[in-house]
């Protein structure tokens, strides 16, 4: 099976990636005769020690704010630690920023099995993703920004020398990237080494944010990587580049006009730099069962411009009650993602719907016609391998809508890892669920709102001009995407674009 390289940018993204890699760590054979039942090389790179043992490391590049690595020193497992005992306190520099390791990490360093992880880990001692990370990263995989600190709040970083400047909008991220070009060569080299370690590259996963400057930074970084290693353009690459954009409303729960415009710009630019774009927080490993085509081909159905997967749901399974696709058990309630991923908690639906909706909600005011009806272009299900009986109950088909069903033996295993806070599902570790990823016309409502906002905004500040850059081009980009989420017989409420 082909390898996957992961790029993770931001503290939130790194929380998500850590759960992925902790799940991968649980598959590593630590005993000589232990059977290997997983393709560990997909997400992990391997190297042999002089004693013949195999080391596993994440096949990833991680980016964070300054001090975002928490208690982790990127070189500590690869160099002899410095002894500060004989250095006078007055000569020690910046040690006030040193963060002590929690008990869980201390146990890992000592080789003590953390059988009591549930009682050791808490919201209070897992502020950083490194507080419960279980794998050792290569130093070249860990990158921190030059000018922005993590600060007291995980939502936005602050400039190291000018704390009033926040790491909150698209153009700020672009500027930070351009100011850090001295690091670009090493980042390109690190990415190249990851690619060279692959025998058959399957694709690149990118986890970033929609609501901070990480969107601009990610766009600039991807532009360099794609130009250098993917034949000069996203349309020319034979590899998949899937981007997962983390959405939140910011510290106050409300967005300023600059932040709203920044979110629009980020969404459009990240979608342009991807072969599939998911405004969600995770992606289960999947294997097709009904088609020899790739997952990407199945979802796109030939419409490669309709790449934004806008409808995401997580549904519980109660096999004893399954009779059709709409009777799949009770609601997943009391979900508190924010406590563990530092994300906004999704709102559970009413008890009759049987799911929570992880789709990105409409984020700007909209004007919609009462005649508008939501229609699905394609529906996609990822089900647990052991739930094969679900296919006997129903074929996951919905009134002629093109549907794809994928099996994954990993989709429920993640909640069995000792670092996963399974109690957010108000359930035990044997909790079963499947996921649904759909593409529908509903996204055009959001796109129309984006277009209206950009058309009507006045470029009366340097910051807005920096975010939008070329207003006409941004409107054209939105219109281009909008075409592919609109059905031909839909009543048109479009206005002329001549007035921008």
Swiss-Prot record:
Mitochondrion as UniProt keyword: yes
Keyword Mitochondrion part of the UniProt annotation: yes
Primary site of residence: mitochondrion
Signal peptide, first to last residue: none
Keywords: Mitochondrion
Compartments reported by the entry: Mitochondrion
GO biological process: mitochondrion organization
GO CC terms, sorted: mitochondrion
Similarity-based family: Belongs to the misato family.
Reported function: Involved in the partitioning of the mitochondrial organelle and mitochondrial DNA (mtDNA) inheritance.
Descriptive protein name: Protein DML1
